[in-house]
């Protein structure tokens, strides 16, 4: 499912126009990106959490020259699925 298909589904479920659904979805995504970029954690109960995590510096190799090189530490975005989301995707076995 791409963004256009998601907008269509949200518009239908919420009984709003596609333009309104697109505006709300775009605003929500931009807000999540801004919050995570500034170091905040965004938690949507039942769905999951968005946050940025520190990736440590490590040693790597240049694939062309096979020469060792230092890969610097960096921040990366991360998503952790909530319990309800995980259970919907993979129901617990009885």
Swiss-Prot record:
Asked whether the keyword ATP-binding is assigned, the reply is no
**GO cellular component terms?**
cytosol
GO terms (BP aspect)? chromosome condensation; heterocyst development
Keywords, alphabetical? DNA condensation, DNA-binding, Heterocyst
Q: Which GO terms describe its molecular function?
A: DNA binding; structural constituent of chromatin
Q: Which Gene3D superfamilies match?
A: IHF-like DNA-binding proteins
Q: Which SMART domains match?
A: BHL (SM00411)
Note the PROSITE patterns from the entry: HISTONE_LIKE
**InterPro entries referenced in this protein's UniProt entry, alphabetically:** Hist_DNA-bd, Histone-like_DNA-bd_CS, IHF-like_DNA-bd_dom_sf
Q: Which Pfam families match?
A: Bac_DNA_binding
Which family is this protein grouped under? Belongs to the bacterial histone-like protein family.
Quote the function comment for this protein.
Histone-like DNA-binding protein which is capable of wrapping DNA to stabilize it, and thus to prevent its denaturation under extreme environmental conditions. It is essential for heterocyst differentiation.
Q: How does it assemble?
A: Homodimer.
Q: What is this protein called?
A: DNA-binding protein HU
């Amino acid at each position: 499912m791409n963004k256009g298909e998601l907008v269509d589904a949200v518009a239908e479920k919420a009984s709003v126009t596609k333009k309104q659904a697109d505006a709300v979805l775009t605003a929500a995504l931009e807000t999540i990106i801004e919050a995570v970029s500034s170091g905040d954690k965004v938690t949507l109960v039942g769905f999951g959490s968005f946050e940025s995590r520190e990736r440590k510096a490590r040693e790597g190799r240049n694939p062309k020259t096979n020469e060792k090189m230092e890969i610097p530490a960096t921040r990366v975005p991360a998503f952790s699925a909530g319990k309800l989301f995980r259970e919907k995707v993979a129901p617990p076995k009885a």
